[in-house]
Regions:
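Acidic, polar-rich low-complexity tracts and alpha-helical solenoid repeat scaffolds
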Residues: 1-137
């Protein structure tokens, strides 16, 4: 991909310009899909802490991805599930992370079909946070 871009930079008026741009577009699509599948795999295998980090990295690298909505939703879901599995002394912080992820999801995708499900995770996270805060006292 870098070589194709270098070629286009060196020869901007080449007759191969459209072909090179098409190849670059296809390669970027493959890289995006590979990054998505890798991040999604952590979630599928119930490695929620790793899933959250990998999905957030995916969102940083590919903010306009066709997978962006699903990735942001899975960040929320993985943070919630990670908080659920955590020890009581760590739950407060992790539920707070899930709540923050809900607000990010709702702000970025206010028309999402998954917004109702996200709201359920938000409610459960708030309940979990309140419970964890009470237990810490």
């Amino acid at each position: 991909m870098d070589e194709l871009q270098l070629f286009l930079d060196r020869y901007p008026s080449t007759i191969l310009k459209d072909s090179c741009n098409s190849m670059i577009f296809q390669l970027r699509g493959k890289l995006e899909t590979k990054a998505w599948k890798g991040a999604e795999l952590y979630f599928t295998t119930s490695k929620y802490q790793s899933a959250s980090k990998a999905l957030q990295q995916f969102m940083n690298d590919w903010p306009t991805s066709r997978y962006a909505e699903e990735a942001q939703f899975l960040v929320l879901k993985s943070q919630f599930l990670y908080a659920e599995q955590s020890t009581s002394r760590r739950q407060e912080e992790r539920y707070a992370d899930a709540i923050e992820s809900y607000f990010t999801f709702a702000a970025r995708f206010p028309e999402s079909a998954r917004l109702n499900e996200a709201e359920q995770f938000h409610r459960k996270s708030r309940t979990g946070l309140e419970k964890a805060s009470t237990e810490q006292r």
